[in-house]
Design a protein with these regions (language model features):
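N-terminal amphipathic, basic helical "cap/leader" segment at the start of enzyme domains
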Residues: 1-142
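C-terminal accessory/binding modules appended to enzymatic or scaffolding proteins
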Residues: 41, 46-47, 145-149, 153-156
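Small-aliphatic-rich amphipathic alpha-helix that forms the alpha element of a beta-alpha
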Residues: 70, 91, 144, 150, ...
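Short conserved micro-motifs at the rims of enzyme active sites and ligand-binding pockets
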Residues: 103-105, 155-158
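Short C-terminal domain-edge/linker segments immediately following a structured domain
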Residues: 122-126, 138, 148-149, 174-178
Length: 178
């Protein structure tokens, strides 16, 4: 890896961030601010035990505050080659069972810490279907989808630019999981 390649990568990342700043989600139906609140501090071992590693979900709802805390954790910076505030991925989710929240498909707008309802009354089986028809995901209260515009990534960062998206997505998925 030569210094020219590093300079080109840095220019590509800057171009990618400029494009991401100008993108907008035009399918917004309803926007709702998230409501993160401090939660009782737990030890790492307690968090790991409670994180839902079981192959079965209880089909019990989570609260809007719990969902908000998960989403809020996704806004903290990630130390990498690019500014996390100018992410290369978008976060969508299907809310199957969240108290004080309509069932549906949502977009998490990290710029203003809000969620945008994209489609109301999405049935539980849709989240399972989208996860390779695994019923496990129909049972979950919320199912997250981390997406990117792969064509744009490849055009700007080259045919291996997807790796940056995978790296960022892995960190985000880890935060959701815990």
């Amino acid at each position: 890896n030569s210094s020219d390649e590093v300079r080109e990568w840095t220019r590509s990342i800057a171009t990618m961030q400029e494009i991401r700043e100008t993108e907008d989600v035009n399918v917004k139906i309803q926007s709702k601010p998230i409501d993160p609140r401090p939660i009782i501090s737990q030890s790492l071992s307690d968090v790991i035990l409670l994180r839902g590693s079981a192959r079965k979900f209880s089909r019990q709802p989570i609260t809007f505050t719990q969902l908000s805390n998960i989403l809020y954790s996704l806004t903290t910076p990630t130390h990498s080659d690019f500014d996390d505030k100018k992410s290369m991925v978008d976060i969508y989710f299907i809310a199957n069972d969240v108290t004080k929240m309509q069932k549906g498909a949502y977009f998490f707008n990290r710029k203003d810490n809000s969620i945008d309802l994209l489609k109301a009354n999405v049935q539980r089986n849709v989240s399972g279907y989208l996860c390779l028809e695994q019923s496990l995901f129909s049972d979950a209260s919320v199912v997250f989808y981390i997406m990117t515009n792969l064509g744009l990534i490849v055009d700007i960062l080259g045919n291996r630019g997807y790796r940056s998206c995978q790296f960022e997505s892995g960190i985000i998925a880890g935060r959701i999981y815990l």
